[in-house]
Amino acid sequence: MSLEQRKIPAPQTNPEIQPFFDAAAQGKLMVKRCAACGQAHHYPRAICPHCGSDRTEWREASGQGTIYSYSVMRRVPSPYAIAYVALAEGVTMLTNIVDCDLDALRIGQQVKVVFKPTEDGPPVPMFTL
């Protein structure tokens, strides 16, 4: 059973992160950027972790990134990859790498976002080569 066959649980949402999942349903990857210091951050939150400002805003990300680190889980029923992906916007996301040969993964490879459906909720961003 591959990740595509395995049911992905729906993420827990709340009003603070709902715009992230609303955009995902439209095929857009969003990140928060601070209007005070200009730094992007992920996981989305109202207070900037860099300067403490509450002047954060949603910005559409390019969906392009680089594998910073990864691990292939080779457990039954099928292998899957977990990775930290450094986005072009400067934030790092913990995610899955999908739809590719897991043995071909390498740190530093370029990846792009894809959105995968969940059991009963919004799609979630994952990445592929």
Where are each of the predicted segments found?
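Short functional micro-motifs and their immediate structural scaffolds
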Residues: 42, 55-57, 75
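Short, cysteine/histidine-rich loop/knuckle motifs that typically chelate Zn2+
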Residues: 33-36, 47-53
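Short, conserved beta-turn/loop elements at beta-strand boundaries and strand-helix junctions
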Residues: 71-78, 116-118
